[in-house]
């Protein structure tokens, strides 16, 4: 069954719902701040899923050499560039900000395709999706019902750990020639990233609650990107762990 039309229809319906909920008289509103942020997160996940499914169904991955280091770094810099542009643009620049965000989310979908293929080929895709969803629900519930357990002072520590983890991952890709050694340390790093992005999800959810209370001009796209990336990275690293790669 071709599920792409269903995803596209869901994207249109959700996009219309966001417009009706997040805007009043064509202006952003702080009302339903948390709900609107999560609607953007769900919309982001739907766009990523659609991108991956389109690439899979039409074999578009054959035009991109994902195993090439040069291709990896090109997509890495493009994705980071679009992320920075999206975060920099004012939420009042509605069309430009949404266009930049859409390109960024699509790039995430393209770069996620090898993980999707890995999960599909090793038959761990469904179980990984379930595990990711379970972790997200549990941690989100904790963040909303026990916000006092989470401190915004975690930010510098989490940021240092994230940068260190990314540098280790890049170093592993560049300098490790033996595939067995690479896989071993890659899995160890993935366990570390699962813990790190779980903590980041708690932190970002707490920050969402604080921003909702202090809202003056809502920035739903920026707010949603942090939690969206936490979820994507949880899924990616859980897939690597379950696939043993």
Regions found by a protein language model. Name each.
Residues 1-245:
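A hydrophobic alpha-helical transmembrane-helix feature that marks the membrane cores
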């Amino acid at each position: 069954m071709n599920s792409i039309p269903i995803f596209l229809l869901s994207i249109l319906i959700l996009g219309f719902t966001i417009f009706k909920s997040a805007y009043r008289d064509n202006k952003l509103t702080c009302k339903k701040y948390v709900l609107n942020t999560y609607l953007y997160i769900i919309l982001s996940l739907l766009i990523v899923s659609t991108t991956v499914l389109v690439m899979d169904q039409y074999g578009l991955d054959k035009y991109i050499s994902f195993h090439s280091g040069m291709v990896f770094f090109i997509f890495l810099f493009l994705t980071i560039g679009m992320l920075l542009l999206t975060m920099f643009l004012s939420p009042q620049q509605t069309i430009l900000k949404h266009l930049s965000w859409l390109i960024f989310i699509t790039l995430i979908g393209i770069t996620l395709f090898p993980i999707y293929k890995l999960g599909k080929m090793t038959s761990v895709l469904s179980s990984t999706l379930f595990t990711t969803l379970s972790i997200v629900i549990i941690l989100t519930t904790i963040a909303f019902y026990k916000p006092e357990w989470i401190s915004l002072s975690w930010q510098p520590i989490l940021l240092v750990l994230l940068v260190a983890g990314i540098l280790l991952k890049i170093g592993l890709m560049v300098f490790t020639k033996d595939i067995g050694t690479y896989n071993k340390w890659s899995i160890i790093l993935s366990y570390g990233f699962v813990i790190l992005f779980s903590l980041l999800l708690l932190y970002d959810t707490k920050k969402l609650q604080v921003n909702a209370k202090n809202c003056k001009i809502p920035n739903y796209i920026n707010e949603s990107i942090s939690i969206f990336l936490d979820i994507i990275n949880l899924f990616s690293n859980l897939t690597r762990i379950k696939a043993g790669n």
